[in-house]
Amino acid sequence: MEILLQKVYDQENLSKEEMTMIATEIFEGRLSKTKIAAFLMALKVKGETAEEMAGIAQAMQRVAIQVAFPAGTAMDNCGTGGDKSNSFNISTTSAFVLAAAGIPVAKHGNRSISSRSGSADVCQELGIDINMRPEDMTYLLEKVGIAFLFAPHVHPNMKYVMDVRKELGTPTIFNLIGPLTNPVHLETQLMGIYRRDLLEQTAEVLGQLGRKRAVVLNGAGFMDEASLAGENHYALYENGEVHLYTLRPEDVGLTSYPLEAITGGEAKENAAILRSVLDGEPGAYLDTVLLNAGFGLFANGKVTTVQEGVDLARDLIRSGLAKQKLADLITYQKEVLAK
């Protein structure tokens, strides 16, 4: 093990198998916090490879609590976080739009690591229980079409790195691979990433992990979401191939806004923003969700273009169907908790 750690310290790449070995040591609690911190920072400085990302993702999935759901039907749209944009909870809001389109959404998420409000924080503020049992998550996916999967709850072995990540206060490989480790076997995925240089290789990793179709995007301003502030870069994985594209908000009939226009706050403020979007209140928040939900619908294959996705997302919000998904989730959750 010391030899493998030294390779990383010496800026040498690890094979998938070598990374799996180190990750297993971490997830079984056999590496000290000091060594974990040194390892994570050395990886960050060196730069994470596709092999390393796949290796640690597979190790995480092996020790995860599995959530049963028919293979090949669900999707996720969570991002890496770590873009320091202090935006509102875009992917969480968009998830209700995707669910309203009839797509089962297994929304993987966590508390804030480098922002003021993570998806788990805003979900709690909305009244969503983030500590459901796996069988309850399955029930909600089946009955409502959306469930929140709290990362520390379904990845209990991550307890060995949570304190280290919080103390480091900077994105690490765990930000990059968190969205890759959903305990539901996904068919499609939209994944925002804060590093534009990793678009192509992350899409390749999703293919290695069994996705049939996926979009990995990096927004203007290097957001881990699609942005209205300029050009968005994304990689589409399909049929074993990856293709790179760009898209501006004007390309799909949306108005440009500066990044400051979608600034969020603490969980209470972000929950209010989420509700205002699902109510259809016009402005930068709504248009940002339309763009991101449009990408999600496109990643899923529900539509053939992002433009069609934006149009469908607008209809789903105007009709009240997206707002109803939030209400249904809370209603059926109470039914589960009352058992």
Curated annotation (Swiss-Prot):
Q: Binding of Mg(2+) 2: at which residues?
A: 224-225
Q: Which residues does 5-phospho-alpha-D-ribose 1-diphosphate bind?
A: 79, 82-83, 87, 89-92, 107-115, 119
Pfam families in the cross-refs: Glycos_trans_3N, Glycos_transf_3
Record-listed anthranilate 2 binding positions? 165
The record's remark on the cofactor is: Binds 2 magnesium ions per monomer.
The residues that the entry says bind Mg(2+) 1 are 91, 225
Q: Which cofactor does it need?
A: Mg(2+)
Q: Which GO terms describe its biological process?
A: L-tryptophan biosynthetic process
The GO terms describing molecular function are: anthranilate phosphoribosyltransferase activity; magnesium ion binding
Q: What Gene3D superfamilies does the record tag this protein with?
A: Nucleoside phosphorylase/phosphoribosyltransferase catalytic domain, Transferase, Pyrimidine Nucleoside Phosphorylase, Chain C
Q: What class of enzyme is it?
A: transferase
Which domain of life does the protein's organism represent?
A: Bacteria
Under the cellular component aspect of Gene Ontology, which terms does the record hold? cytosol
Q: Which reaction(s) are listed as its catalytic activity?
A: N-(5-phospho-beta-D-ribosyl)anthranilate + diphosphate = 5-phospho-alpha-D-ribose 1-diphosphate + anthranilate
* Cited NCBIfam families: trpD
Protein name as catalogued: Anthranilate phosphoribosyltransferase
